[in-house]
Amino acid sequence: MFGIGLESYTVGSHDFYTAYCATRKQMFTLDTGHYEPTENVSDFVSTLLMYVPELMLHVSRPVRWDSDHVTIMNDQTLDLFKELVRADALNRAHVGLDYFDASINRIGAYLVGTRATQKCILQALLEPKAKLREYEDNGQNFERLALMEEAKSMPFGAVFDYFNLKNNVPVGEEYIAAIQQYEKDVTSKRN
């Protein structure tokens, strides 16, 4: 529960809401835009999933000077979805994205946030999870670390482009021109 019109203000405490949801088997909300910059929301996922049936993820960015709230592909968002995939918990997570930003085109904000989230989920799904678990189970820590490092440079971008191509969605930055055209043809004519 957040105060109306009061950004960065939370009524209650994280501990209270965690205990409330855990003792009543309720869905717990993690709002990625309301944590300290040194906290990584993904660190809470595996523990919470032991006690609550589902998670509601409000994926955004903290209040900053640059396009606040619009979801981007950053380490925090990628780590969040990697944690969900590694825990086999995508089916227990409900994802909502935040597109609030009065300084940029709303449709552009929507697409930037959606595409960034899709890229993070895809990169998490493409991680060689089975092999990493095998290394973990066998105590092969060097091999696990080496494979995790190699996975960072695997070409998920080509897979994302192919996915978009197969679904008749603009590939790469082609969507920018489509948004500009829509803005010219439609949104600029609104009062």
Protein language model features and the residues they cover:
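Histidine-acidic metal/acid-base catalytic patches
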Residues: 9-11, 18-30, 36-191
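Active-site-facing alpha/beta catalytic cores
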Residues: 1-10
